Amino acid sequence: MKIILTVLAGVGLLSAGGCGMLDQVNDGLNYTSEAAGYVEKVKTFAEEAPELAEKAVNDTEAKEKLEAQLESIQKAAADFNELTPPDAAAEIHRTIQEHNETLQKSAEDVLKQAEEGKVSLKELEQSDLVQNAKQITDVMGQIEKLGE
């Protein structure tokens, strides 16, 4: 009887330890999925923003769309910064957070220009906005490795 209880206790302890590991794996996969989604959003923004900025000079609809995208990218960056990365992704997360600070500031500057009707492709290209967006998308390869 003691042997059976010992075996059951051992199995219970192993199962409990395995659950913690499983939670860590799930947390890592969830983070990877959220980070990849964020990076994809930033990539799409970086691709579309220059054309929208060019059109926004003479097109109210394009200006409104650019403003909406700028606000959306600011919110997405803030939401990403609030994620809790797994230990394996802590350095990558900090790198993206650093880029996010500049991205958010640049988005705010371009948003003000758009609201004042002063946005242009040249202004956008001279801002850190698109450059930081591209730097964030460059981190995608590192994020994909976390999911493996």
Swiss-Prot record:
One Gene Ontology term, aspect cellular component: plasma membrane
One Pfam family cited in the UniProt record for this chain: DUF6376
Membrane protein topology class: Lipid-anchor
Location of this chain's protein in the cell: Cell membrane
Major location (coarse): membrane
UniProt entry keywords in alphabetical sequence: Cell membrane, Lipoprotein, Membrane, Palmitate, Signal
Stored InterPro entries: DUF6376
Residue numbers with lipid attached (N-palmitoyl cysteine): C19
Parts forming coiled coils: none
S-diacylglycerol cysteine lipid attachment residues: C19
Signal peptide: 1-18
Identification of the protein by name: Uncharacterized lipoprotein YybP
Species annotation: Bacillus subtilis (strain 168)
Gene this chain is encoded by: yybP
